[in-house]
């Protein structure tokens, strides 16, 4: 199925959840924030957040500094 990740069309397996997408994008263990269709998804909800055709996903990487 087709979704959008940070504005780019991305093909993913039907029924994938957010945890699967994070793994597919090799972001497991990274400090990120995720939004689906303009709704923030807490890290604790990644496994329950199933993606649907044409969902808009935004992934933001936390950058440390000082």
Located regions from the model:
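Compact, glycine-rich, soluble single-domain proteins
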Residues: 2-4, 9-53, 58-61
